[in-house]
């Protein structure tokens, strides 16, 4: 059986890693051994941050809703309690968008929440 030399396979593997590391600084984009570590680490960061993004957006939405609610004389927690009592099911993403872009509509929702709390 003929001996298989690994040149083609190794070259392909190196090119793949170096392509993924394109745009990295210095040796991280040029040296295979360093680039491989950088690509692995980047993948770990990407995996972690896909999960963190969901938490960060929820926190941002809550901060925006809280700011809008306080302008209308209610705290975030009281607003959410009022919405639950009034059986208004609007998610935080939409509420935050209303608080920022549609202040009148948000104020109307806050008033309904206030009425259900009274």
UniProtKB/Swiss-Prot annotation:
Disulfide bonds listed in the record: none
InterPro entries in alphabetical order: Ribosomal_bL20, RIBOSOMAL_L20_CS, Ribosomal_protein_bL20_C
Write the record's keywords in alphabetical order, separated by commas.
Answer: Ribonucleoprotein, Ribosomal protein, RNA-binding, rRNA-binding
Recorded GO molecular functions are:
rRNA binding; structural constituent of ribosome
Q: Which SUPFAM superfamilies match?
A: Ribosomal protein L20
| Annotated transmembrane regions | none
Q: Which domain of life is it from?
A: Bacteria
Task: Give the record's GO biological process terms.
Answer: ribosomal large subunit assembly; translation
- What Gene Ontology cellular component terms go with this record? ribonucleoprotein complex; ribosome
Q: Does the keyword Metal-binding apply?
A: no
Tell me which family the UniProt entry assigns to this protein.
Belongs to the bacterial ribosomal protein bL20 family.
* Annotated function: Binds directly to 23S ribosomal RNA and is necessary for the in vitro assembly process of the 50S ribosomal subunit. It is not involved in the protein synthesizing functions of that subunit.
Query: Under what name is this protein listed?
Result: Large ribosomal subunit protein bL20
User: From what organism does this protein derive?
Assistant: Stutzerimonas stutzeri (strain A1501) (Pseudomonas stutzeri)
